[in-house]
Regions:
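Hydrophobic alpha-helical membrane segments
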Residues: 1-237
Length: 237
């Protein structure tokens, strides 16, 4: 279903992916340029601009690809201005939802680290158990929020409500989500594998191939997630 949706507007979809990824890389470049600058003021300015552009382009990329996936899954076409503009409350909700996910995963990791430290001190032979539980907890948080952008954009939920709906979806459909996870991980790993192969064939080619492959793969990932959301969302038949 996701691949069928991608055929609806291929130029818009991959053109948007290329532009958003380009801005994302520009943010990285500005931040890196600040490290080699002798002027403290200019270095601070470059760092601030880099972080700001990095964060804004990441949110724009996730929101845009999610909107495209939802629209194409419903058989609707989108226009460029619908992707380019800031959507006010929805965009803020999406940004806060992503922040909620990061903080929740960090909290789960911190709790797991504290439990591991305690068990390592008291029962060293069992120290692997809290480590495994911590990894499982972080993975569960991230997997439960796989549809967070779709919930915010499609159902116009608040960040906290979208988080709760994500947890509920995981509790009801965890076998389907676990089955989807290897495919998404394989798609995400594909650009890096191609980059390593290109670097082995010719020095200096790895980064360029990785970036180009990432531009191509990200819309496929977003379309797959959006198609899965349409099947598993509340009220879906």
């Amino acid at each position: 279903q996701g691949l069928r949706g991608l055929r609806l507007q291929p130029r818009l979809t991959w053109g948007f992916s290329a532009l958003a990824c380009g801005l994302h890389l520009l943010g990285w470049g500005l931040f890196a340029a600040g490290h080699g600058n002798d002027s403290a003021v200019l270095a601070l300015l470059l760092h601030a601009m880099g972080v700001g552009l990095y964060a804004a382009s990441l949110i724009w990329l996730i929101e845009g690809l999610s909107r495209l996936g939802l629209a194409h899954g419903a058989g609707r076409r989108m226009r460029w201005r619908q992707l380019a503009r800031w959507h006010g409350r929805q965009s803020w909700s999406l940004a806060l939802g992503l922040l909620n996910t990061v903080l929740s995963a960090a909290a789960a990791a911190l709790a797991g680290f504290m439990a591991w430290s305690l068990v390592l001190f008291l029962l060293p032979a069992l120290s692997v158990l809290p480590a495994l539980l911590a990894v499982a907890a972080v993975a569960a948080v991230l997997l439960s929020q796989l549809f967070n952008p779709c919930l915010v954009l499609d159902q116009r939920l608040s960040p906290s409500a979208a988080f709760g709906h994500g947890v509920a979806l995981l509790s009801r459909h965890w076998p389907a989500l676990l089955a989807l996870l290897p495919l998404l991980l394989a798609l995400l790993a594909l650009p890096f594998g191609l980059g390593l192969l290109a670097e082995a064939l010719g020095a200096g080619l790895g980064v360029a191939v990785t970036v180009l492959a990432m531009v191509a793969v990200l819309p496929v990932i977003a379309a797959t997630v959006s198609a899965a959301y349409r099947q598993l969302r509340p009220g879906a038949r």
